[in-house]
């Protein structure tokens, strides 16, 4: 149902004046639940359509370049492009955020977002627009008040292409119950996908491709129900990081699962510089607790394949690295954390630091380190020494290739409720090669 602008404007005007005449009821009847609002046919800008939308509506966006920042504040609104590659939000390296969704159940799908100073797509419970302008949190910002800004409930990003943004491509911060899937992120000055400051998160990151970012996927102070499954993370400076820090609330991070991913060749020079100087790292756990890294293919990273470290004030503990294929990295496995409950088993490494790591800190039948009760601390392992080269400005990273679009963008839309649904990491086997993932959902 496409509703014309004049009808909707009349409905809004009547609501604003508090009119209770039969005309008001008639206008409501012409805006039934699930209305499709079309841009540019019915509205000149996306924000105009979003402002008129009600819960359960879809804003369907036709091909074009939209130079605007969009705020989605109402619940259960779906923002969808008719063509993933031809519907483009462009910040012109001038606007701060592309699409910011604070409404519960928001969906952003089948479109491209590029050249914003901060984030391409932001899902957050932080409703203060001044804080949103600063990125709404993240590694460069102070902790935010989770009582004042409770997590937004329900979000989804599907088939989103985001590139050349100054912080994050797709950013879920202070958000719960979501899915980020089948998306492509490149050229971000920080990370392609970032999940931060949530407990429980109940967030699924699956089937995405991360390339030519400073960091591919970043999980910070995000705990309970974080699943990173079946993604391709290649050609970044750093592949995947799982962190605890004091620059956001809800530390320490706990209980993420990384399974069935390919993390390869994360030492690309044609990328933005990583803020901490990281380069050539496949998977890095910095102060994470109770995380599981299993059945991932981790190869070709010049510094290290998988490393566990203790950042100041946040000792890593209870992390399990099992059943991966970690090969052809500067150092395949590195344990630089003191707690004996971290363990490594069955990862097929050629190199380990400290030497014999899997024998000294193997995982027992219950997943805990087989030597946790009596082994004591091991010598701290070290990654191979790598000098990070100079990077390129985020706005100058080449655009990614065209990506698969929705088969039928006119299909009925579904808000982001009841997510992520059943999540089964065991359904994601060890990839046989770098072409094995991602698989569309």
Where are these regions (language model features)?
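C-terminal motif of bacterial Sec signal peptides marking the signal peptidase cleavage site
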Residues: 15-18
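Bacterial signal peptide processing site
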Residues: 20-22
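Acidic Gly/Asp/Thr-rich repetitive segments characteristic of extracellular carbohydrate-active
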Residues: 27, 32-61, 65
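Extracellular beta-strand-rich solenoid/capping regions of secreted or surface-exposed proteins
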Residues: 51, 65-78, 88-150
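Parallel beta-helix/beta-solenoid
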Residues: 54, 74-75, 84, 103-104, ...
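Short glycine/acidic-rich loop motifs that flank beta-strands on beta-rich extracellular proteins
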Residues: 66-72, 91-98, 117-123, 166-173, ...
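Acidic, glycine- and Ser/Thr-rich low-complexity intrinsically disordered tracts
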Residues: 327-329, 334-441
């Amino acid at each position: 149902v496409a509703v014309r602008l004049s009808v909707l404007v009349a409905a809004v005007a009547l609501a604003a004046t508090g009119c209770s005449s039969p005309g008001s009821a008639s206008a409501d009847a012409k805006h039934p639940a699930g209305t499709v609002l079309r841009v540019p046919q019915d509205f000149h800008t996306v924000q105009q359509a979003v402002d008129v939308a009600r819960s359960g509506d879809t804003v369907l966006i036709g091909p074009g370049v939209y130079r605007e920042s969009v705020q989605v504040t109402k619940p259960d609104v779906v923002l969808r492009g008719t063509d993933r590659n031809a519907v483009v939000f462009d910040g012109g390296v001038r606007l701060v955020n592309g699409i910011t969704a604070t409404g519960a159940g928001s969906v952003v799908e089948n479109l491209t977002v590029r050249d914003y100073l901060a984030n391409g797509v932001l899902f957050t419970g932080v409703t203060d627009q001044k804080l949103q302008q600063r990125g709404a949190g993240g590694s460069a910002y102070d902790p935010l008040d989770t009582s004042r800004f409770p997590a937004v409930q329900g979000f989804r990003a599907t088939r989103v292409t985001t590139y050349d943004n100054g912080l994050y491509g797709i950013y879920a911060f202070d958000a719960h119950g979501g899915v980020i899937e089948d998306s492509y992120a490149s050229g971000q000055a920080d990370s392609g996908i970032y999940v931060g400051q949530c407990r429980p998160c109940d967030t699924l990151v699956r089937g995405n491709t991360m390339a030519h970012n400073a960091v591919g996927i970043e999980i910070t102070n995000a705990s309970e129900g974080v699943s990173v499954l079946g993604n391709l993370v290649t050609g970044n400076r750093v592949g995947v990081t799982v962190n605890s820090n004091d620059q956001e609330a809800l530390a320490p991070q706990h209980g993420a699962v990384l399974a069935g991913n390919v993390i390869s060749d994360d030492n690309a020079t044609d990328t933005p510089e990583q803020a901490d100087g990281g380069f050539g790292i496949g998977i890095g756990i910095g102060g994470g607790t109770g995380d599981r890294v299993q059945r991932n293919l981790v190869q070709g990273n010049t510094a290290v394949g998988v490393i566990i470290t203790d950042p100041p004030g946040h000792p890593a503990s209870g992390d399990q690295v099992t059943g991966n294929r970690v090969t052809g990295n500067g150092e395949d496995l590195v344990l630089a954390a003191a707690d004996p409950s971290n363990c490594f088993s069955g990862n097929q490494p050629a190199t380990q630091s400290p030497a014999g790591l899997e024998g000294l800190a193997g995982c027992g039948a219950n997943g805990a380190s087989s030597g946790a009760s009596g082994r004591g601390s091991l010598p701290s392992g070290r990654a191979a020494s790598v000098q990070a080269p100079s990077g390129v400005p985020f706005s100058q990273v080449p655009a990614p290739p065209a990506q698969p679009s929705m088969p039928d963008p006119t299909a009925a839309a579904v808000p982001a409720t009841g997510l992520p649904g059943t999540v089964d990491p065991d359904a994601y086997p060890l990839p046989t090669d770098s072409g094995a993932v991602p698989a569309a959902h």
